[in-house]
């Protein structure tokens, strides 16, 4: 039922169902992780962070929890060194994962390390040409004065997933449409 609600973007209802399930089984790291992801969708960022930290305590090898927490910090441009450490731990647990590599590239960009960000994001995009990775890679290219290549990457991302929120928001924010 939660999956159906997620697919139709009924985040609040999905969150409530997961919350009820987690009351019955409070130490289920996977359910807590799912609830954390729904908390983020309904802008309960503090709750998301608490839930992800609980997941990490319960299941220290849960790479996606480290990545989600680190990415959330990086995306909000807060506690960037902590974000980098969390994402680096996720990458240790699942080396080569393009989504985690994307997150590390994003935090490096937020830290002002554009060359390292570009290297990581190019690698992630080459492995998995995903629209969200395209959004991040394009933004780094844009910031480095490579607008034509950024537009090309974004166009590829739109072809793959025209409705991707991160890509759409990036283009609007940078006035790059």
Name each region found by the language model:
Residues 78, 131, 136, 143, ...:
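Terminal, low-structured helical/coil segments at or just beyond the last alpha-helical repeat
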Residues 24, 58, 93, 126-127, ...:
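Structural marker of alpha-solenoid helical repeat scaffolds
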Residues 7-20, 42-54, 76-89, 111-123, ...:
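Structural signature of tandem alpha-helical TPR/SEL1-like repeats
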Residues 31, 65, 100, 133-134, ...:
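TPR alpha-solenoid repeat register
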Residues 70, 124:
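Bacterial c-di-GMP phosphodiesterase catalytic domain signature
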Residues 3, 28, 37, 62, 71-72, 97, 106, 130-131, ...:
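Residue-level recognition of tetratricopeptide repeat
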